[in-house]
Amino acid sequence: MANTREFSLDKTRNIGIMAHIDAGKTTTTERILYYTGKIHKIGETHDGASQMDWMAQEQERGITITSAATTAQWKNHRINIIDTPGHVDFTVEVERSLRVLDGAIAVLDAQSGVEPQTETVWRQASTYNVPRIVFVNKMDKIGADFKYSVSTIHDRLQANAHAIQLPIGAEDNFEGVIDLIEMKADLYDEDQLGTEWDTVDVPDEYKEEAQAARDDLIEALADIDDGIMEKYLGGEEISKEEIKAAIRKGTLALEFFPVLAGSAFKNKGVQMLMDAVVDYLPSPLDVKPYKATDPETEEEVDLIAGDDKPFAALAFKVATDPFVGRLTFIRVYQGTLESGSYVLNATKDKRERVGRLLQMHSNQRKEIPEVFSGDIAAAIGLKNTTTGDSLTSIEHPYHLESMEFPDPVIQVAVEPKTKADQDKMNVALQKLSEEDPTFKAETNPETGETLIAGMGELHLDIIVDRMRREFNVEATVGAPQVSYRETFTKSTQVQGKFVHQSGGKGQYGDVWVEFTPNEEGKGFEFEDAIVGGVVPREYIPSVEQGLKEAMANGVLAGYPLVDVKAKLYDGSYHDVDSSEAAFKIAASLALRNAVKTAGPVILEPIMKVDIVAPEDYLGDVMGHVTARRGNIEGMEERGNAQEVHAYVPLAEMFGYATTLRSATQGRGTFTMTFDHYEKVPKSVQEDIIKKNGGTPAK
């Protein structure tokens, strides 16, 4: 028997909550869940009791690491919420959730306005064309300034953002908000945990300011809406419904960003934020159709939301749940799926059976019989599915656009404290790397050492912490190491010849290869330019494989050789003695011989670092950046502080948090994201080679 849909598509909202760390994102989500009746006790993040931060380390650290997906109901709408982390080490979680959202709430701290990480997530949201509303949170905080916060959206994000509310008071006197569309004030009763408020006329002392702000709002809407423009120029009255319709239209087109005010912690303004989600953010029917490829015809197809179409969904996260095991979070773009049925993992071309379907509320779960178009849910039983895979009906395989994840930039060696833990550690690392595509674990075949790599120190700290808590593996962690790379800077032509005679069948392989530098990020490209069969066809894949294997270990200090083109253009063979193995070795010898003439260099990851510190400490901060081989790109004022933008090698950033804390008496903060790879200075290169026991290029 078919199940019925609880909420129609136009009454469904898939939203994310995004912000800089500590802007109050998790608390805002908490309050939304409280007022929509999902939780009966408010959890405070700073007490480590938040409902959304469900991993033990999240509760301890008071930051959100994994995007918990939850569902809530408000005014006959279903709202699926994904709480995303604001810490830069976890931007992949943000990117991953933005892929499956239709709209987002950007939370700002009313004292700081737009902060560095806000800019990062805002850019990511723009990449995925996600409409946004802005919530200026923490209006109760000392130094809260609504006007300043709105101005930072214009200045730092170049976004057409306008207030649709004004706060009544600020700091300790923050009492509620003025609705500029209705021209009414909502005043909260402190004792009722935000569940009750009075809607009254705008207080006299705010009337002039509110009218001016409303006029500004209408003027801004006239710029993007012809209907409003005509009435505005003709001096006609514009109805509340027309204003709301224009805001919705502008928001969906990413031409307008409504701004609201409130304090999630003090339980003020959250219900109005929910109203704005329903009024202004898109349903799955309002967004551009999601693109997919038909693997048979290679043609692009649009996935249009609707239950009557073939099933197509994206697996956007894999998590291990202590009670039910492996959970695969999916976003359904079209069609429906019943628990117990089969789907095709179109990415891996494997059939999978969906055991059970769950709707998640943070880390609690409710079993559901079926998911519908537009839903976000978790599936149990998908053994081969990893993040970014396409799940479709067996008859209609589609490849949905896959996700791209950055390579890790930092690695540490981990060793189990006891031999008995080795197997447990291997299982733990395998499960954790399935969950997180930016985390990699590998064993060095020569030393037997296990290396784990990720996006930053905090990222790896949390992985080690999770091994201990979830898998009972105690591990010793080495000092962080940088993921260097090697590349060639010059073109060269070299021979690689391997001849081995020792009685019986010999070995013979002979190749001539031209190596040239490739564009950054293009990786290794192999070209077969053999004419006249001087190297027989069957040995050519072995030459490519031999080069790949040799490049994995580099030529200078054992780091992977990247961004190189290799053209096999000549060689010779022996009728009896040639073999695949001989040509593989010949190729690796060619690479080794290229070292003398190809100008090999070591590349290091360069981080984009944004440092915010009070003006008095600016000299010290800039001095530290320069001392760490950093380049200062520019500075800008941020309230009473200065923000320094710089590019600094990752190798020089270890321990910087402590340095900055002591230099600014705890008042400086910084964020750091990977930007690009760059050649290391000669002296540094020599040190790296020496440390790794490599061979300097002559």
Swiss-Prot record:
Keyword Nuclease among record annotations: no
Pfam families xrefs: EF-G_D2, EFG_C, EFG_III, EFG_IV, GTP_EFTU
Compartment(s) of residence: Cytoplasm
UniProt GO MF annotations: GTP binding; GTPase activity; translation elongation factor activity
GO BP terms: ribosome disassembly
Protein's UniProt keywords contain Cytoplasm: yes
Entry binding sites for GTP: 19-26, 83-87, 137-140
InterPro entries the UniProt entry points to: EF-G-like_DII (IPR053905), EFG_II (IPR041095), EFG_III (IPR009022), EFG_III/V (IPR035647), EFG_IV (IPR047872), EFG_V (IPR035649), EFG_V-like (IPR000640), G_TR_CS (IPR031157)
Keywords for this protein: Cytoplasm, Elongation factor, GTP-binding, Nucleotide-binding, Protein biosynthesis
Coiled-coil annotated spans: none
GO CC list: cytoplasm
Domain called tr-type G: residue spans: 10-285
Family annotation (PROSITE patterns): G_TR_1, G_TR_2
Family the UniProt entry places it in: Belongs to the TRAFAC class translation factor GTPase superfamily. Classic translation factor GTPase family. EF-G/EF-2 subfamily.
Main function: Catalyzes the GTP-dependent ribosomal translocation step during translation elongation. During this step, the ribosome changes from the pre-translocational (PRE) to the post-translocational (POST) state as the newly formed A-site-bound peptidyl-tRNA and P-site-bound deacylated tRNA move to the P and E sites, respectively. Catalyzes the coordinated movement of the two tRNA molecules, the mRNA and conformational changes in the ribosome.
Protein name: Elongation factor G
